[in-house]
Structures are given as C-alpha cells and as structure tokens.
C-alpha cells in the first residue's frame, strides 16, 4: 500500500495500517523529503504500482494525478474512521522537515475535517465547499514585508463594512448546502472592533459547521467580544511571532473559557507577495496553479467571492486587470 501525503493525516493512516496488518511501502509527497516513521517518502512519479490511500482534505487535488499515474485510490477514511488514536505520540514532518507536535484534540479535529470533506466529495449532488476565508479588515498590527495577503500595500487600510458582510453571509448560505469552515482573516481580525458581531452571524448559520479565527496574538479580544467567541463552532489558530506580545494572556483566556485553539510558531517564510508581470507561458501558469497551496482558499471580500486571498487583495488594490470571470458577485449568484 502507498500513502499520498506525509502530514499528520498520513501519519495516522500509517498507524492505522500497521494496526490492521496492512503493509505500507512508501509515502508520496512533493514537499516533504526523507522518511516518516521509517517509511520512505518519494514523488508520485517514483512510486511503485499499486493501491494508494489519499489523505488530503482536498481529495480532488490528489485524484487527477493519481489516476494519470494509473494507481488505484482509496480514501484514507477507509482505515482511520474508527481508529483509536489514544496513546499515540503524534509527530509529523512538516514542509521544512522539522517535527511539529499536535495535541490529541487537534488531531481529532483534523481527522473529522478530512473524513467530512472526503464524504462530501463522494456525494457531489450536494453543493458544498471546504472553506471560505472571510476578510473582515485590511488593517493589521504587523507590517510583514512579504505578507501573502498583501496587507503591506494598503496605504489607508479599512475594516470591511459590517452590514455588507452580514448580508453576504446570509446570501451565500442560502445558495450553499454546506460550508464546512469559515476562516476569519485580516489583516489582524481583532483590529475590527465589530468582529464579535460577525462571529455571531457565522455561528448562527446551521450550514456553517466551523468558524476559525486566525490571529497573530498581538491584540486581546475586548471584554464584550468574549461571549460571542465562546461557541462550540469557534476555534482560534494562533501564529506565534516575536511580536506576539499577547500570546500568553490570550492562551490563558482561551483555556479559561474553554475555547479550542491551536498555537504554532512561524518557523519559516514564503516569499509570495510579488506584484509584477512574469511573462509566463500558459503551461507554466497551469503548473504554478496546480502546486499553489492557496488555490482552495476561496475568499469573501466586499461582497465578492474570489479564488484565494491573494487574488481578492490584488483586485482590491487594483493591481491586476478587473476580469469578471475571476470572481463571483455573491448578490448575483
């Protein structure tokens, strides 16, 4: 057996296979090199013939290349759905070949997400989407030179209009059967003093299953915001920088209030904020799109649904031509 994906779900799949006595010959991964728990990691081209478990929540991105390679694929859910992960010390290799620890709670969250999205893919009659990034502000408490969301280019950053956001949320939920997760982003979301009102609107929607708030831990939520954040759908994703001066008080409050969170250090930096003409060929553009880590991060901004945050902000900054085919006006859907 082969496992496509050497991340945490791939590691869980390996443990489940070993428990069931299923031999695993190798992992397939194009970002991670070396081996994981004694199993070699190879490229898809170098993989042997046989059956392969797909472990990415974005299962559709794996199916095409696997079928072109002539391999028979299965969802990893076939082996991890009822697998008991208690007692396992989870450590997976990330894209920088460094160990990254995961709490059992977060591992279970990742498993549920993967299984849910695989199940949705197997039932295409439902109009579902894995995640939508909701951009609540252009304002940020940091000024990262190569910010992937292009915040460094806003000369007069503003918060998103609250009424427009609430109307857009209602409209898009009317059109969809399910949105698994809405990712609340900025800038820094807590620069918007009305953030809690947005979170309230999101958690009220039955079709929205999870609400993720991405923060750099430089700003504490206001007292009046906490009640809205204390919802079973809400989870904080904290990126730790040297400037994350509110990290410890924030974590203390999250734990005190029973709010789920994941906190990880910013271990590396990707230079992906170049606004310039590259003169690439169509095949080169297609190759870049296939390998893009953000191509499934649909983004809501100013009443429009874009393919990713970079695209949304490039349009807002008038840095790219305004092609109507590149976004969806939600009110017209």
Q: Where are each of the predicted segments found?
A:
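Glycine-rich adenosine-cofactor-binding loop
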Residues: 1-17
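Structural motif
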Residues: 4-8, 30-31, 53-59, 77, ...
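Phosphate-bearing ligand-interacting subdomains
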Residues: 20, 32-101
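Conserved alpha-helical substructure of the radical SAM core
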Residues: 102-213, 220
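Acidic (Asp/Glu)-rich catalytic clusters
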Residues: 172-176, 225-232, 254
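Non-cysteine beta-strand/loop elements that form the S-adenosyl-L-methionine
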Residues: 233-243, 262-266
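C-terminal accessory region of radical SAM enzymes
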Residues: 258-271, 310-333
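Hydrophobic "anchor" residues
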Residues: 305-306
């Amino acid at each position: 057996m082969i496992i496509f994906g050497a991340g945490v779900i791939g590691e869980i799949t390996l443990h489940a296979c070993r428990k069931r006595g299923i031999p695993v010959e190798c992992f397939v991964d194009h970002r991670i090199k070396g081996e994981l728990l004694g199993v070699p990691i190879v490229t898809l081209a170098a993989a042997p013939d046989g059956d392969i478990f797909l472990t990415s929540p974005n299962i559709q991105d794996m199916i095409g290349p696997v079928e072109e390679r002539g391999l028979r694929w299965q969802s990893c859910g076939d082996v991890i759905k009822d697998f008991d992960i208690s007692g396992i010390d989870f450590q997976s290799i990330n894209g920088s070949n460094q160990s990254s620890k995961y709490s059992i709670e977060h591992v279970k969250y990742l498993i549920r997400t993967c299984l849910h999205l695989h199940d949705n893919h197997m039932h295409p009659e439902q109009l579902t989407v894995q995640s939508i990034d909701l951009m609540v502000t252009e304002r940020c408490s940091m000024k990262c030179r190569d910010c992937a969301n292009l915040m460094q280019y806003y000369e007069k950053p503003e918060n998103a209009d609250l009424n427009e956001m609430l109307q857009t949320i209602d409209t898009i939920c009317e059109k969809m059967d399910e949105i698994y997760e809405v990712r609340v982003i900025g800038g820094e979301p807590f620069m918007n003093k009305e953030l809690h009102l947005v979170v309230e609107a999101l958690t009220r929607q039955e079709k929205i299953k999870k609400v993720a708030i991405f923060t750099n831990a430089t700003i504490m939520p206001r007292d009046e915001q906490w009640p809205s954040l204390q919802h079973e759908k809400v989870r904080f994703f904290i990126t730790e920088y040297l400037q994350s001066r509110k990290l410890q008080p924030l974590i203390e409050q999250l734990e005190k209030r029973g709010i789920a969170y994941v906190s990880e250090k910013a271990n590396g930096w990707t230079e992906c904020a170049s606004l310039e003409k590259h003169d690439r060929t169509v095949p080169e553009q297609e190759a870049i799109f296939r390998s893009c880590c953000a191509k499934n991060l649909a983004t809501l901004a100013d009443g429009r649904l874009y393919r990713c945050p970079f695209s949304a902000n490039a349009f807002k900054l008038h840095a790219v031509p305004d092609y109507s085919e590149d976004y969806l006006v939600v009110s017209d859907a």
